[in-house]
């Protein structure tokens, strides 16, 4: 059991050698003896720790649990060998703990039960009495956790507020959050074998978490690997939660206190039962609620600071969001942060509200004198180091803050109501935006329809103008097309006059081939010259030998003959080599000619292909031009039909205008005739009008006298009474009873003088105008003016034929 405890302290292969070197000498003398006796000793100590002789109780002055009167490690109950063994073990533990590079050894030691920790701590003779009693007390609490949690929960909370011993923190955290009996612990190894989609994101954030801590500092270290495994397993359990650095801060604290399986279980409990999962969701609705509650607390307890924050636009989320997300793990140093985390494991997020408000109370005077940037610097640099001496002052101030859970629930309801209203308003705004967009689209469509309906005459006129412009542009384009075609023909003629490019290429190839043959011939000539030189040398030597042949012996003569034959063979060889070279030369010429022909053939094929492509393109263009021509003909036919219709319409309009002009001319002629008649009548009226009026008055007076005379002779009972003189119109051939010479005279005088009285012709009797009869001479003169001055319409109303007038009395 001790060997497993020791080996757990050296999991990190990078630190294993250092720690081993430090403790190897001290452990070598006791290791064999420890293996034989440690199991018996530990069981004896555990039974002594769990004995009912020392019970938990509270005092009236303090709520802490009392310590027993006698330590279970008392020398009176342990043998000297046991005491020596325990002292040596504790000494080795202290050496391992003091080594900064073997931090993992503490975590390994926490894998054991609380009873073994109590036994190892109680045996230390160097610890103070108070620390020893604290260890024993926490050992009893751990062993009797179920009963203590049910019966004395307040005392446990008070002990947690005073601080959990370092060696008990792992087991106490598990007990506080009920993580020991989780079934998910058995699934941890299976989860590590699976692949998570968030692995890259986890790797990226791990390197940025606690970069100054030795346990997580080095890349791919044991700490980073443990952190990656736990976070990967949780990402497979809770796929909705997106991993963030704040999540890793809480997980780091767990991984530094306990093995990774237990850290995984504690982390799952934190996310499920301590509202951390709601804080880390993408929507962060729980964080908004915490910010609202904390801001209301500031407004209630620190109103001046709240007003200062509002005036500087210093929002609560700018400094307090990290407090709730990391439980002050990234704000304070690790010892202070773990003390706050102990209370968080016991009491939840309440400690965050208390500590945050206590910090603001203690720094209110400094914050009131700073602007927004200064306050940010103060929160980032000053506040984290205010409690380096110890967290007792901070925790004491935090529990002096008034925290009302009922009011916090009320604020939660208010926040929920506000958010619900905001969501409803947002939904209403979205609905209105959608309706507005639909209405805009409908307005646009209506405007389009309206514009299309308002084309009518303007649109037709515009189309006519565009048609005229299109005809003009078509004529211009046809002229330009003819000019371009002429230019193309000229360019083709000039191009045909130039030498063919194929001939140039062929000549260049032939030139290259000739140069190659010339170079080969020169090389062959040089070789032949060299051979001729060698043959000449051989020939000279042969002549020198044959000149003295008759003096030589027969053997030497035979040798000379053989040499002659050899020379003749060499000569024939040279001749054959010359012939071979000639054949090679001819062969090379043939190959060169073949290559030239193949190049010419390839170029001819390329030309044929290019010509075929041109033919295809020209055929396509021809089809397009034919289609354009047919379209142009169709348009021309339509235009001609329209022109004919327009011509017919113009002719009809011309005929109508001619008829209207003829009518107007006839009307003008009639008006001119009436004008002439009026002029003549006016001339007649102006001549001797005054004298005629006097004569007419005299005649009227005579006629009235005659009428009066006739009244006594005849009865005019059948006639209507006369108010004056009535002039009755009679057509020619009418019969009247009474005609006298005076009436005939008046009638004839009226016809001859054409008096200017306005005689209104009616179907009944016509009367003279009384204004002319009773008026003065000046008024008569004014009334008898010409028809153009008095009544311009009078000449038009007078009939062109004269009628006879007679007066009946």
Curated annotation (Swiss-Prot):
- Which domain of life, per UniProt? Eukaryota
Residues annotated as region Disordered? 49-80, 99-123, 760-809
The disulfide bonds in this chain are none
**A GO term from the CC aspect:** centrosome
Q: Where is this region: Interaction with alpha-tubulin, gamma-tubulin, BIRC5 and FBXO5?
A: 1-483
According to the entry, every stretch annotated as the Rab-GAP TBC domain falls at 163-348
Post-translational modification here is noted as: Probably phosphorylated by PLK1; may be required for degradation during mitosis.
Gene3D superfamilies documented for this protein: putative rabgap domain of human tbc1 domain family member 14 like domains, Ypt/Rab-GAP domain of gyp1p, domain 1, Ypt/Rab-GAP domain of gyp1p, domain 3
Per UniProt, the ranges with Low complexity bias are 51-78, 103-123
Q: InterPro entries, per this entry?
A: Rab-GAP-TBC_dom, Rab-GAP_TBC_sf, Rab_GAP_TBC_domain
Any idea which UniProt keywords this protein has? Cell cycle, Cell division, Coiled coil, Cytoplasm, Cytoskeleton, Nucleus, Phosphoprotein, Ubl conjugation
* Any one Gene Ontology BP term: cell division
Q: Which residues form a coiled coil?
A: 406-717
The signal peptide stretch is none
Region of interest (Interaction with AURKB and INCENP), residue spans = 487-809
Q: Which Pfam families match?
A: RabGAP-TBC
Q: Do you know which SUPFAM superfamilies this protein is assigned to?
A: Ypt/Rab-GAP domain of gyp1p
Q: Give tissue specificity per the record.
A: Widely expressed.
Q: Which residues carry this modification: Phosphoserine?
A: 102, 113, 497, 689, 776, 778
What more does the record tell us?
This gene is a common site of retroviral integration in T-cell lymphomas of AKXD mice.
Q: How does it assemble?
A: Dimeric and monomeric. Interacts with alpha- and gamma-tubulin. Interacts with FBXO5. Interacts with the chromosome passenger complex (CPC) which is at least composed of AURKB/aurora-B, BIRC5/survivin, CDCA8/borealin and INCENP.
According to its UniProt entry, what is the function of this protein?
Answer: Functions as a regulator of cell cycle progression by stabilizing the FBXO5 protein and promoting cyclin-A accumulation during interphase. May play a role in cytokinesis.
Q: What is this protein called?
A: Ecotropic viral integration site 5 protein
Source gene? Evi5
């Amino acid at each position: 059991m001790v060997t497993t405890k020791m080996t757990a302290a050296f999991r990190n292969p990078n630190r294993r050698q250092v720690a081993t070197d430090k403790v190897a000498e001290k452990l070598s003398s006791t290791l064999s003896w420890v293996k034989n006796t440690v199991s018996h000793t530990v069981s004896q100590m555990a039974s002594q720790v769990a004995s009912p002789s020392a019970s938990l109780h509270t005092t009236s002055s303090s709520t802490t649990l009392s310590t027993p009167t006698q330590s279970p490690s008392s020398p009176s109950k342990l043998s000297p060998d046991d005491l020596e063994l325990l002292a040596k073990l504790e000494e080795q533990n202290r050496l391992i703990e003091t080594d900064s590079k073997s931090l993992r050894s503490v975590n390994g030691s926490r894998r054991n039960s609380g009873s073994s920790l109590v036994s190892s701590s109680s045996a230390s003779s160097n610890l103070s009495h108070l620390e020893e009693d604290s260890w024993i007390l926490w050992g009893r609490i751990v062993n009797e956790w179920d009963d203590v949690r049910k019966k004395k929960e307040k005392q446990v909370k008070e002990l947690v507020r005073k601080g959990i011993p370092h060696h008990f923190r792992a087991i106490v955290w598990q007990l506080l959050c009920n993580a020991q009996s989780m079934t998910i612990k058995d699934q941890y190894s299976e989860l590590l074998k699976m692949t998570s989609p968030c692995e890259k994101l986890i790797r990226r954030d791990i390197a940025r978490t606690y970069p100054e801590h030795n346990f997580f500092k080095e890349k791919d270290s044991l700490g980073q690997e443990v952190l990656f495994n736990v976070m990967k397993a949780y990402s497979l359990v809770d796929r909705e939660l997106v991993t963030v650095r704040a999540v890793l801060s809480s997980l780091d604290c767990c991984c530094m206190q306990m093995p990774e399986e237990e850290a995984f279980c504690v982390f799952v409990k934190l996310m499920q039962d301590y509202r951390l999962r709601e804080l880390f969701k993408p929507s962060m609705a729980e964080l908004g609620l915490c910010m609202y509650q904390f801001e209301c607390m500031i407004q209630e307890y620190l109103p001046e600071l709240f007003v200062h924050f509002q005036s500087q636009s210093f929002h609560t989320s700018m400094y307090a969001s990290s407090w709730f997300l990391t439980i002050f793990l990234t704000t304070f140093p690790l010892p202070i942060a773990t003390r706050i985390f102990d209370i968080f494991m016991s009491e939840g997020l309440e400690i965050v509200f208390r500590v945050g408000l206590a910090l603001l109370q203690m720094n209110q005077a400094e914050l009131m004198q700073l602007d927004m940037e200064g306050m940010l610097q103060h929160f980032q640099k000053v506040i984290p180091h205010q409690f380096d001496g110890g967290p007792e002052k901070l925790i004491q101030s935090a529990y002096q803050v008034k925290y009302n859970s009922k009011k916090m629930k009320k604020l939660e309801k208010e926040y929920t109501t506000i958010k619900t209203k905001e969501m409803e308003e947002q939904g209403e705004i979205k609905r209105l935006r959608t309706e507005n967009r639909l209405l805009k689209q409908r307005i646009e469509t209506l405007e389009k329809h309206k514009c299309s309906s308002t084309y009518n005459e303007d649109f037709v006129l515009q189309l006519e103008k565009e048609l005229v412009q299109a005809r003009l542009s078509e004529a211009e384009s046809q002229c330009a097309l003819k000019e371009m075609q002429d230019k193309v023909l000229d360019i083709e003629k000039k191009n045909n006059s130039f030498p063919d490019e194929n001939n140039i290429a062929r000549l260049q190839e032939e030139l290259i081939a000739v140069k190659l043959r010339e170079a080969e011939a020169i090389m062959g000539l040089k070789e032949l010259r060299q051979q001729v030189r060698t043959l000449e040398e051989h020939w000279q030597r042969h002549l020198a030998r044959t000149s003295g042949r008759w003096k030589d012996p027969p053997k030497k003569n035979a040798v000379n003959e053989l040499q002659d034959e050899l020379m003749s063979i060499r000569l024939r060889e040279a001749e054959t080599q010359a012939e071979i070279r000639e054949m090679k030369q001819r062969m090379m010429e043939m190959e060169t000619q073949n290559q030239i022909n193949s190049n010419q053939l390839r170029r001819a094929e390329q030309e044929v292909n290019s010509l075929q492509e041109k033919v295809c393109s020209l055929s396509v263009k021809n089809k397009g031009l034919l289609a354009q021509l047919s379209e142009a003909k169709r348009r021309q036919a339509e235009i001609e039909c329209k022109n004919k219709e327009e011509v017919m319409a113009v002719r009809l309009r011309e005929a109508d205008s001619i008829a209207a002009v003829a009518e107007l001319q006839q009307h003008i002629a009639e008006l001119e005739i009436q004008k002439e008649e009026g002029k003549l009548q006016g001339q007649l009226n102006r001549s001797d009008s005054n004298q005629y009026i006097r004569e007419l008055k005299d005649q009227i007076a005579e006629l009235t006298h005659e009428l009066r005379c006739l009244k006594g002779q005849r009865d005019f009972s059948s006639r209507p009474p006369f108010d004056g003189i009535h002039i009755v119109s009679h057509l020619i051939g009418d019969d009247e009873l009474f005609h006298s010479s005076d009436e005939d005279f008046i009638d004839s005088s009226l016809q001859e003088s054409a008096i200017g009285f306005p005689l209104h012709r009616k179907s009944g009797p016509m009367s003279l105008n009384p204004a002319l009869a009773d008026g003065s001479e000046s008024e008569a003169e004014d009334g008898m003016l010409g028809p153009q001055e008095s009544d311009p319409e009078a000449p038009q109303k007078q009939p062109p034929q004269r009628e006879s007038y007679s007066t009946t009395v």
